[in-house]
């Protein structure tokens, strides 16, 4: 029988990107924490499949993959020049990059509905205008991304939701003036 499945370029793109992320980890760290490449793949697959449902024109799978690939090269350069990146830090950084714009996707946070999006940890919401895209969530996407990772990774035995959320917070733009310090002790 003939297959009725359509040619799915998004799945191919996701698989190829995750192959690269896994293989770069293996090239850098060898057999250290051999389960970590699978963590990258499983968290990355989850994030990319969710982001693939986004209707925001720019903050999509392609953008998230490009951010992860460039971020990985920056991290690899830091590792090669300083040697100061652990395998655990690597995994958290890559997962953070893959999840950094997940807050643009409608329906991902507990309490989201077809007409309302949760915008912070206090459960405040914003009404979604009829016909809006995920780009409407721009002012809230960092908080929503943090809510998502706290919900998704809260009980994970290896991935720290707190670390991922802190990294997502570092993507906020413009950079907040109040309380912001030039802390360069993390990624």
Describe the function of each predicted region.
Residues 1-56:
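Non-catalytic interface/linker regions that flank or bridge core catalytic/transmembrane domains
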Residues 42-69, 127-135:
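Active-site flanking loop/helix segments enriched in acidic
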Residues 48, 68-76, 146, 150:
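Amphipathic, well-packed alpha-helical segments that form the structural scaffold of globular domains
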Residues 53-92:
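Alpha-helical phosphate/pyrophosphate-handling elements in metalloenzyme active cores
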Residues 67, 90-109, 145, 166-174:
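His-Asp-centered metal-binding catalytic motifs of divalent-metal-dependent phosphohydrolases/nucleases
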Residues 86, 108-118:
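"Short basic amphipathic alpha-helical interaction patches in structured regions
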Residues 94, 140-187:
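Histidine/acidic-rich helix-loop-helix segments that form or flank divalent-metal centers
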Residues 116-143:
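Divalent-cation-assisted or electrostatically stabilized phosphate/pyrophosphate-binding catalytic cores
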């Amino acid at each position: 029988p003939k297959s009725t499945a359509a040619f799915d370029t998004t799945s191919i793109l996701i698989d190829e990107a995750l192959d690269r992320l896994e293989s770069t980890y293996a090239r850098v760290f060898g057999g250290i924490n051999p389960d970590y490449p699978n963590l990258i793949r499983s968290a990355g697959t989850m994030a990319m499949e969710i982001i693939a449902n986004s209707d925001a024109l720019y903050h999509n799978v392609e953008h998230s993959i490009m951010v992860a690939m460039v971020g990985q090269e920056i991290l690899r350069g830091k590792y090669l020049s300083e040697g100061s990146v652990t395998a655990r830090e690597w995994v958290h950084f890559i997962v953070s990059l893959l999840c950094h714009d997940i807050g643009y996707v409608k329906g991902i946070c507990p309490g989201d509905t077809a007409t309302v999006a949760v915008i912070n940890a206090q459960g405040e919401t914003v009404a979604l205008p009829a016909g809006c895209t995920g780009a409407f969530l721009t002012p809230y996407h960092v908080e929503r991304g943090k809510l998502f990772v706290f919900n998704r990774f809260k009980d994970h035995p290896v991935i720290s939701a707190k670390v991922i959320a802190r990294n997502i917070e570092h993507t906020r733009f413009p950079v907040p003036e109040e309380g912001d310090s030039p802390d360069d002790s993390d990624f």
